[in-house]
Swiss-Prot record:
Species whose genome carries this gene: Shewanella woodyi (strain ATCC 51908 / MS32)
One MF term in the entry's GO annotations: sulfur carrier activity
Gene that encodes the chain: tusA
Keywords: Cytoplasm
Record's protein name: Sulfur carrier protein TusA
Active-site residues, record numbering mapped to chain: 19
One GO term of the biological process aspect: tRNA wobble position uridine thiolation
Length: 81
């Protein structure tokens, strides 16, 4: 795991879950976070490669890093406003 991913303040394990569950869990987790905090999402649903970046853009969160070459996929997001 890269150093950037290991520095996340929160972590969400969405392994084995299929659309729309991972994004629903991300949304619930982010609501509990303070602005600027980071969340590492670990998932294996191929739909997350599209859904997580779209969620971040739509909700004004920042996708800091992603690893989608191999499973499990990893996404590091930072909560926006």
């Amino acid at each position: 795991m890269s150093n950037q991913f290991s520095e996340a303040q929160h972590q969400l394990d969405a392994l084995g879950l299929r659309c729309p569950e991972p994004v629903m869990m991300v949304r619930k987790s982010v609501r509990k976070m303070a602005q600027g905090e980071t969340l590492l999402i670990i998932a294996d649903d191929p739909a997350t490669t599209r859904d997580i970046p779209s969620f971040c853009e739509f909700m004004d969160h920042k996708l800091l890093a992603s690893q989608t070459e191999t499973t499990p996929y990893q996404y590091l997001i930072q909560k926006g406003l």
